[in-house]
A protein has these predicted regions:
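N-terminal mature ectodomain segment of secretory-pathway/periplasmic proteins
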Residues: 1-36, 40
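Acidic/charged, solvent-exposed loop-and-adjacent secondary-structure segments enriched in E/D, K/R, S/T
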Residues: 40-67
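Anionic-ligand binding region
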Residues: 64-82
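Gly/Pro-enriched, hydrophobic low-complexity segments
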Residues: 76-163
Length: 164
């Protein structure tokens, strides 16, 4: 693919393993994790994928890694870190330490501003693809528990791709 796929949306994180990602545009999706289940909903297709977390799910380490990096919690135990100071913040190259994380991605580049807030991430996947996310309008306000809940609408086709 010569042209990158570009989308916009919103993302919320709550350590250690809760997040919500709403993607808008031609291919909208909603991804929600409450720490026990991960849902990916595709409104255009009225379909949802449900993944169980915990019990050594292959998704656990990926979710933990991203949350760890963005919240700078236990990041030194999760990644090998190569960092440098830049004019308006810091750039960190985070390489996964564990085999389970290494099976999900090669590295995560994280750009932080001087207030240590994430501005940009770039994840290098195993196949060479890159996922770049730019963060803005950040807040540390408390989030209601419902932010990390998902119930499929009636008529939604629900699958469990990992069979759990």
């Amino acid at each position: 693919m010569k042209k990158p796929v570009v989308s916009s949306g919103k993302v919320w994180f709550q350590p250690p393993n809760k997040f919500r990602r709403e993607v808008k545009g031609n291919s909208p999706s909603l991804t929600v994790s409450d720490g026990h289940q991960l849902w990916i909903y595709y409104p255009n297709f009225k379909s949802a994928e449900r993944y169980s977390l915990g019990k050594r799910s292959p998704l656990d380490s990926a979710i933990a890694a991203i949350n760890s990096a963005l919240n700078l919690e236990d990041v030194e135990n999760t990644f090998t870190i190569n960092a440098r100071k830049i004019d308006d913040g810091y750039e960190l190259e985070l390489t996964p330490r564990t085999p389970s994380m290494k099976s999900v991605f090669r590295k995560l580049n994280l750009r932080l501003n001087n207030n240590l807030r994430a501005e940009r991430t770039e994840m290098l996947q195993l196949n060479g693809d890159r996922i770049v996310t730019i963060y803005s309008n950040q807040t540390r306000a408390p989030l209601p528990a419902s932010t990390f809940e998902f119930t499929p609408a009636p008529g939604t086709d629900v699958t469990t791709p990992l069979g759990r």
